[in-house]
Amino acid sequence: YQEAVVEFDRSGNITDFRFALDAQTAESMERCGDVASKEQRMIILQYVERFRTAYNQKDINTIEKMFSDDALIITGKVIIARQGTDQFSFKPKVQYTKQNKAQYISNLRRAFLRNKWIDIKFSQIGENGETSGCSGITRSRKNKNMFGVRMRQSWKSSNYSDEGYLFLLWEFPENGGDPIIHVRTWQPEYVGG
């Protein structure tokens, strides 16, 4: 089953619907990371849920609004290549692509059309990729409105699947408006620092 979050206005009208992160990820985001306040953690959690929901619903307009016009986007896909002359020996290889917002949205539109369904899930990550650690949320020391959010991503669709780690650099405007993503990167495995 999948949990969802529904928000209502004072008149009882639905103002927002999004798929909820699993309880373990939400708890990890609550207790971990160098985030200024509980309010900011809740806002980050809400936007991560909206981000995931937009992909699962193939809502290209919402995704496009979430990215800065000058966003740096690095995507990766796992390609299975034959190793040597042995027809039964295959080795996974990752192909990375650096894109701007227009290229990414165009490629994502095609991916949405190619797939009957998409199911993205985010989960926590720990030290060196181990389980039961904290999801990574860091606040920029130079710009207090910038937050890096790191999480494990499981991408499953009707014709492709992979697992890896996603990093999003969000800017939360001082005026309280919707945050925008300046950087989105993906890698197949955790690289510790």
What function would you assign to each model-found segment?
Residues M29-C32, I80-P92:
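Acidic/histidine-rich, surface-exposed loop or edge segments in extracytoplasmic proteins
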Residues V6-I14, K142-K144, W170-I181:
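Short, solvent-exposed coil/turn segments at beta-strand boundaries
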Residues Y1-E7, D86-E163:
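Surface-exposed, charged secondary-structure patches
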Residues Y1-F17, Q187, G192-G193:
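Amphipathic, hydrophobic N-terminal targeting peptides for secretion and organelle import
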Residues G12-Q57, N61, K65:
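Short, low-complexity N-terminal intrinsically disordered segments enriched in polar/charged residues
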Residues R52-N56, S68-L72, R109-W117:
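Sec-exported extracytoplasmic/periplasmic mature domains
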Residues D59-Q83:
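Short, well-ordered alpha-helical segments enriched in acidic and aromatic residues
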Residues R18-S28, R152-S157, H182-G193:
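Short, solvent-exposed aromatic-acidic interface loops
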